[in-house]
Amino acid sequence: MWGYCLGLVEIGNVKSKGFTLMEITIVLTTLAFIALAALPVLLDIHRQTYAAMLHSSQSSLGTALKFFHAQSVIDNAYDQEHVHYIDRQVKTRKGMPEASADSIRALLEIDLPARGYSKIDVPCKGSDFCIIGQQHPNSAHFVAIPDYQFLDKSGVDRVVYIWPQGYTLAEEACYFYYVNQASTDSIVRGHVTQGC
């Protein structure tokens, strides 16, 4: 007698439970193909997440710079070496924060290493972001910024780089930056996300 009942197949007097090896292989192969098809989408979502995080952090820096500039104007502090900003002393250069790790740490409310600077050739770990400042085209840890040329090569203009956990600054283009162009009394900020 042939009969089917909730996964039980009766063949003669022998009862078989479960799936055959062929059925399991087909299901696993199908799942593997679905996973492979979804992988590029998941990787792109990961890249977009880091790019959005950098854009957001860079925008926060822009807002902090506007508040800092307003504080400098109110205090008439253009030529001062330090400006008191939200319970912190921020070292300045030509009226704007210098491009140092300490100055950016004082401006941003993001998880950065407590002091010093990060190694650019080792993946960032221990905080959400890593940072290195006071770089210029002739410095040891300088990383060229795509589509940006330093006007002054002598070291007057300086840059600070901030990159996310898990990335290296030296090898991956996934960071945001702030340039104090003291040679022209201006600043530049932006983000690079090609390597995220």
Language-model regions, residue ranges each:
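N-terminal single-pass transmembrane signal-anchor helix
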Residues: 2, 13-49, 53
